Every structure is written in structure tokens, then in C-alpha cells.
């Protein structure tokens, strides 16, 4: 049955989806990645016209009404401050900043559903690389396409000098 209960396996999923998270979307390839994960890699390269961009996704099926959520890790060419990133995002059309984790304010798909904006938050420096940024992003994927979102973010990053113009 749709949604499934413990021990009941809907034909759509290999395991129960109710009260569960499945760490794959689509079929697995010989590389260990799924078709959906490779689609993310290929779309990123196509959108930015740059096959050298490193992308290492893991797609996860989460039983929510709608929307896509992403944990994003970026490495910039130059140093940045979290305040600069927050200010840039706050002033980017189509982006809503929700970044006050101490008060449990961060993007969630439940509140993005039916809205056109992309919601971003949980900004923090990535300690594993020199100029790295980690953040959380959610959007209603029926309202905001991945390509539109990526282009808008890239344009703002180029404008602020975090990415090269070429």
C-alpha cells in the first residue's frame, strides 16, 4: 500500500518508505552512484559549461509531500566571510535567507512547498578545505527548476567575485 507499514513493501520502493529514508534514487550503476546522482553531476557540468567542476552527490528519498533539499559544499577561489555570504543571499532575488540555527530557524521542505523562492541557511565554514562553505537549501521543485536556481546562484557568485567570469 502507498506509504507502506513495517513489513509491507510497496512495489515502487525496495523497502518501506513510511518512517524511513532510502539512500538512493533510481538504479545503481557500476560506479556505485545512481542514475539520479550522475544526472546531478552532468546537469551541473552542462549548466556551468565546465566539466572540471567537482560534484559528488548522494541522493536520498525522504517521505515528504514535496520539494528538494540539498546539503551543499562549495570551495571558492578566494577567502570569504559568512556575513558576506549571508548578505549576498539576503539580497538575491528568488532566495530567502533562513539562517538562525540557535533559534531553530533554517530551511525545511514543509515550509517551502508551494512557494517560488529557494530557501537557504545553516551557513558555516568547511574546515576540510581552505575556502569552503557548507549550507542547506530547500525548494519546491515544481516551482523552482534546478537549472534556474543554479544559474541565479552562479550569477551572484560571479558578480561578487567568488567564481571566475570565464
For each predicted feature, which ranges?
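C-terminal active-site/capping subdomain that shapes the small-molecule cofactor and substrate pocket
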Residues: 53-166
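Active-site-lining helix/loop region of Rossmann-like oxidoreductase modules
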Residues: 1-88
Amino acid at each position: 500500500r502507498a506509504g507502506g507499514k513495517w513489513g509491507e513493501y510497496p512495489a515502487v520502493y525496495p523497502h518501506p518508505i513510511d518512517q524511513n529514508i532510502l539512500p538512493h534514487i533510481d538504479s545503481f550503476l557500476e560506479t556505485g552512484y545512481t542514475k539520479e546522482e550522475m544526472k546531478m553531476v552532468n546537469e551541473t557540468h552542462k549548466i556551468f559549461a565546465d566539466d572540471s567542476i567537482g560534484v559528488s552527490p548522494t541522493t536520498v528519498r525522504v517521505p515528504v509531500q514535496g520539494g528538494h533539499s540539498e546539503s551543499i559544499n562549495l570551495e571558492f577561489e578566494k577567502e570569504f566571510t559568512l556575513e558576506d555570504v549571508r548578505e549576498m543571499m539576503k539580497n538575491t532575488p528568488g532566495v530567502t535567507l533562513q539562517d538562525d540555527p540557535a533559534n531553530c530557524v533554517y530551511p525545511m521542505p514543509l515550509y517551502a512547498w508551494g512557494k517560488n523562492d529557494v530557501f537557504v541557511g545553516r551557513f558555516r565554514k568547511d574546515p576540510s578545505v581552505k575556502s569552503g562553505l557548507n549550507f542547506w537549501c530547500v525548494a519546491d521543485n515544481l516551482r523552482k527548476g534546478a537549472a534556474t536556481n543554479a544559474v541565479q546562484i552562479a550569477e551572484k557568485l560571479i558578480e561578487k567575485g567568488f567564481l571566475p567570469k570565464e
